[in-house]
A protein has these predicted regions:
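C-terminal cap/loop subdomain of S1 sulfatases and analogous C-terminal strand-loop tails that border
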Residues: 1-4, 10, 15-18, 22-100, ...
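C-terminal structured subdomain/cap of oxidoreductase catalytic cores
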Residues: 104, 119-122
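Intrinsically disordered, low-complexity polar regions and short flexible loop motifs
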Residues: 107
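Active-site-proximal N-terminal segment of extracellular/periplasmic enzymes that hydrolyze or transfer
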Residues: 112-120
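Short amphipathic alpha-helical coiled-coil/interface segments
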Residues: 125-129, 133
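Bilobed periplasmic-binding protein-like "clamshell/Venus-flytrap" ligand-binding domains
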Residues: 132-143
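Short, charged, surface-exposed hinge/linker loops at domain edges
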Residues: 141-151
């Protein structure tokens, strides 16, 4: 068991919850069934690790109006995808192909966009993101929604 107060820096996603619950319950999936997440049991028990892997988020739709009180006033109004690998996170917006690159260890608040100052990391993560979208057949909008404009 992990000691109280232990902090883990292992990046996880909600896709890891189901494989974790299956693992805890001792349920083995049929061969050929694939889950996107990984069991967190090795991390939770302190008896193993989860290999570093890219984590993906894909939001191909227009959803809600802007909130001027937030850091990103048009968050969830524009379609895009993002990938996190290690300390790095890349966001790509589909409307204008804007890219944002953040080093989360140095900038957890995502204030300093480093896509211009770190082109090699931008290229690396963009290639990973584009490959994932192709492999998963992720939908990408091809037309702008004129009802959603930057405030």
């Amino acid at each position: 068991m992990i000691k109280a107060g232990t902090i883990s820096e292992v990046p996880v996603t909600n896709l890891d919850f189901f494989p974790t619950l299956l693992d805890v319950a001792g349920i083995v999936l049929d061969p050929g069934k694939v889950l996107d997440g990984k069991s967190l049991v090795p991390v939770l028990t302190g008896k193993g690790v989860i290999a570093e892997r890219p984590l993906f988020w894909h939001f191909p739709v227009y959803l809600e109006g802007g909130n001027m009180e937030t850091q990103d006033s048009i968050f969830r109004t524009r379609p895009g995808s993002s990938v996190r690998l290690g300390d790095w996170k890349l966001i790509q917006y589909f409307e204008n192909n804007d890219l944002e690159l953040y080093n989360l260890r140095e900038d957890i608040g995502e204030k300093v966009n480093r896509f211009r100052s770190d082109p090699a990391k931008t290229t690396e993560l963009l290639a990973i993101l584009e490959k994932w979208r192709r492999e998963t057949n992720a939908p990408v909008p091809v037309a702008l929604n004129p009802s959603f404009a930057k405030p």
